[in-house]
Amino acid sequence: MKASLQGKLDKLADRFEELAGLLSDPDVISNQNQFRDLSREYAEIDPVVKCYRQYQQAVEDHGAAKAMQDDSDADMREMGAEEARDAQERMEALAAELQKLMLPKDPRDGANVFLEVRAGTGGDEAAIFAGDLFRMYSKYADQRGWKVEMVSASEGEHGGYKEVIARVIGDGVYSRMKFESGAHRVQRVPATESQGRIHTSACTVAIMAEAEDLGDIKIRTEDLRIDTYRSSGAGGQHVNTTDSAVRITHLPTGVVVECQDERSQHKNKARAMSLLSAKLYDAQQNAAHAEQAAERKSLVGSGDRSERIRTYNYPQGRVTDHRINLTLYRLNEIVEGDLDEILGALLAEYQADQLAALGEH
């Protein structure tokens, strides 16, 4: 292990002990904000310190095993050689894990997200596919114990959505879903197709971190135009008699957001403002990430919405992620929300890119 990395890990281990002491201090416990911030820091470095302690134990075991190889007894020397090999393997595996754990953290990883699915080319079939994608993400969220709140929806004439936006709330939502932004393509025979021909349709997905506590997104009141209108869709008679839906236009950028899901105009406005903050923050971050990705020739994590990232081929039961050349013949399970294999592979590739970038400096 590099001395520079070991030095950082030693400092983290010291900080971990310091935090443990602070979190049992009555003065800290009585200060809610300080206690929350320190608890968050403790939770963040806990897995790193645990892994480092295992690594230190493996180093110690390796030293003891090496000493056994100098023993006068042949059986002891053989046992020492075997234990040294085992300790060496553990050291290498734990050192690799520590490198990943010490990679720069994306400040957005712990954030909730706004999920936006928009039908692209393909007419009615694209809208139906947008509905399928939204259902897939909703099922994945359900499996992970996350909550999905609808923000706005424009339904397709024959099912699905022309556009749907929802807020996904839970632990580490952005860290799992951040690689889903981009163009998703479907190849299948539509229900309305009498000749049995395969059609190709597309949707774009945007994953935007909720912007609270994520940076200085300053939105001036004079830069906003706020319109209210009557909600459409579900909600009963009450919805149709009140101007509860809210549309907000950010004049400098032309970004428009709306929320019509809540009955209260005040709640709709608050949620629309949150979505606007997320969109502006997302645009700011994507510009920086696109520049970094271009420098590293990296596709995973570039966040380019026009980039075709995945194809869902129904006749072949195949899903292909084009960024990492991963093909899985598990389409039915994937569209039912079983996304862990794909998302895990994307995260591994992203971390490999980060490690390669660190190695260049």
Curated annotation (Swiss-Prot):
Keywords, in A-Z order: Cytoplasm, Methylation, Protein biosynthesis
One cellular-component annotation, GO: cytoplasm
Subcellular location: Cytoplasm
GO MF term set: translation release factor activity, codon specific
Annotated S-S bridges: none
InterPro entries documented for this protein: PCRF, Pep_chain_release_fac_I, Pep_chain_release_fac_I_sf, Prokaryotic/Mito_RF, RF-1
SUPFAM superfamilies: Release factor (SSF75620)
Post-translational modification: Methylated by PrmC. Methylation increases the termination efficiency of RF1.
Chaperone recorded as keyword: no
Sites bearing N5-methylglutamine, chain numbering: Q237
Top-level taxon of the source organism: Bacteria
Function: Peptide chain release factor 1 directs the termination of translation in response to the peptide chain termination codons UAG and UAA.
PANTHER family noted in UniProt: LD18447P
Family to which this protein belongs: Belongs to the prokaryotic/mitochondrial release factor family.
Protein name, as recorded: Peptide chain release factor 1
Protein's organism: Alcanivorax borkumensis (strain ATCC 700651 / DSM 11573 / NCIMB 13689 / SK2)
